[in-house]
């Protein structure tokens, strides 16, 4: 029998809710390891996920090998009253941080199980979650010590605009990255 192939799919918040335990387990597996070392973050993830999946425009991109979850990305559009830009170590101009409907899509998580990395799965999830987005730009945060992720994001067109203090206890500061989305690139 042939080995199962990788499959990718997009889920809305309602469909994603049925995968909450799997997502939480994978989140814990990835973020408890270096360079993140965010032990105990699983409970915080569960609370954040409940909030995120209910946001208008929420989307989850998942990668599976057979039925086995090997990676996912999730995000949602930022609202005008977002706190995304609130904890920057250096303030940015209002023209960067002011949000309006349709301006910014936030990639809240993008992760792949360690044995499945360096196979293009992260890039495929990245491209899937951002494909056909109507927003002008996207943003995400990444820990400076996550050098492989930093290099990947740079090669995918992201640029650092700031650093943010993480409000989660024991979590390191993160770089805030931004990139134009394809519909607006070059306009």
Give the role of each language-model region:
Residues 1-18, 29, 187:
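Conserved N-terminal entry element of GNAT/NAT acetyltransferase domains
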Residues 24-40:
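Helix-loop element at the rim of GNAT/NAT acetyltransferase active sites that forms part
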Residues 37-60, 64-66, 70, 74-80, ...:
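Active-site rim helix/loop that mediates acceptor-substrate recognition in acyltransferases
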Residues 57-62, 72, 104, 109, ...:
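Short hydrophobic/aromatic beta-strand element in the GNAT-like acyltransferase core
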Residues 74-111, 168-170:
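Conserved acyl-donor/pantetheine-binding loop and adjacent beta-alpha core of acyl/acetyltransferases
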Residues 107-114, 118-131, 151-155:
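Conserved acetyl-CoA-binding loop-helix of GNAT-fold acetyltransferases
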């Amino acid at each position: 029998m042939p080995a199962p192939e990788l499959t990718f799919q997009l889920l809305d918040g309602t469909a994603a809710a049925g995968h909450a335990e799997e997502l939480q387990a994978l989140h814990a597996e990835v973020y408890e390891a270096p360079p993140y070392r965010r032990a105990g973050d699983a409970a915080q993830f569960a609370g954040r996920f409940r909030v995120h999946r209910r946001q208008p425009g929420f989307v989850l991109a998942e990668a599976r090998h057979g039925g086995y979850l090997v990676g996912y990305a999730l995000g949602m559009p930022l609202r005008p009253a977002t706190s995304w830009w609130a904890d920057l170590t250096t303030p940015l101009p209002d023209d960067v941080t002011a949000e309006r409907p349709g301006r910014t899509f936030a990639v809240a998580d993008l992760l792949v199980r360690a044995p499945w990395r360096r196979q293009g799965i992260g890039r495929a999830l990245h491209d899937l979650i951002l494909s056909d987005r109507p927003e002008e730009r996207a943003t995400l945060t990444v820990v400076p010590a996550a050098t492989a992720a930093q290099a990947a994001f740079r090669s995918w067109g992201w640029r650092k605009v700031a650093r943010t203090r993480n409000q989660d206890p024991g979590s390191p500061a993160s770089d805030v990255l931004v990139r134009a989305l394809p519909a607006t690139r070059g306009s």
